[in-house]
Amino acid sequence: MQSVAEAVTRLEALATSEPLAALAERFVAAGHELALVGGPVRDAFLGRPLNDLDLATSARPDDILRIVKPIADAHWDIGRAFGTIGARLGAHTVEITTYRADTYSAGSRKPEVAFGDSLEGDLMRRDFRMNAMALRLPSRTLVDPSGGLDDLFARRLMTPGSPDDSFDDDPLRMLRAARFAAQLDVAVDVTVIEAMERMRGRVSIVSAERVRDEMVKLLLSAAPRRGLALLVDTGLAELVMPELPALRLEVDEHAHHKDVYEHSLTVLEQAIELEGARLTSEAPDLVLRLAALMHDIGKPATKRVEAGGAVTFHHHDVVGAKLARKRLTALRFDKETITAVSRLIELHLRFFGYSDAPWTDSGVRRYVRDADALLERLHVLTRADVTTRNRRKEARLRGAYDELERRIAALAEQEELLAMRPDLDGEQIMALLALRPGPIVGEAYRFLLEQRLDEGPLGEAEAERRLRVWFAARTG
């Protein structure tokens, strides 16, 4: 948290920077108000980066466009119907929106757009008080009609008006509360939590895409556990990702098993800790985080208490992969993300067979082949999945995975594991067996791939010999 003086210095530096100062002067000259609003003002006090800038104005969209166009490096009006014009001004990307005074009908997913006449009125209709502050330009006057600055210093999340009215207007704000709790490390006011519990059914009118986008922002925060727990505790998760609260299985004192819900949140935390060190991208990894959160969602459907009292979850990896695919599809995730997450969930138990008894080289090759481009993520997920408090067991599992990674590296040097292919390609198979393209060529290819996985590189001559023997048996 920055001091007021430090935050004001940051805001003044931004307000007096060349593109923003020039923009403000143009709006004033045209007889309109302009203010920096929302996230950038909040983030100046929190010491967070000031990237994309949100501005509010008394000007209508056509006027905004006319004022901005001559000085913008680029501009766009995709949000024009909602009063928003976007522009790039030097190093800054800005969105300039006409003051809003929207209303919401009871069953509608979309607001009835109405433009307002005052900055204060615009701020009071925003989601939370800490987001309802503005800096008037060019005067650099702070406007805080609801007490957002007090909330920032108290690390408290509260709505400008009644939480019930706010969430009734836009139910997505309930998910935003969970996201901000995690993203900004703030405590959600008890009146807001109670309203989330009362109003949770209203989230059903929010489009799947908006829910998805908010869940993604939550998961990509530095510490999403707090926000996810809030969604579960208020009952909102039952409506947006019911597989998560379903993990709160009753723990029988005689049939011991992990608290699957708490375990899943811990796996997510541990995956986040590992991703920075293990994965090449500097950005948070959405696929890994989704897989970590959802890796055990097949357990409720597969829980069995055996005759001796032991609890089992046989095939929860396969069941969980199917459930993840279904949920992520319902939330309108892209096909690539859905495929990657469900595949990681399907593979997440594979290593634990290795920890019991080391595999042959063939088993190691198959592990690499099955993971393919997801191998590094699978390494992270598998390591994160060890949450035992038994230090001896934890050390044994960690050592076993270290050994597996060493074997993968050694075989990779010898055999180019990550680009594993049979010794003959499709063209060679067709030429050798005098075949035309068709299903039998695929069968032959898979036969040679199995040989390659079992034994490593055969060489073309040996591959040709075995292929002829296989083909003779297949067609004879």
Question: Which residues fall in each region the model found?
Answer:
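Catalytic cores of the polymerase beta-like nucleotidyltransferase superfamily
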Residues: 1-476
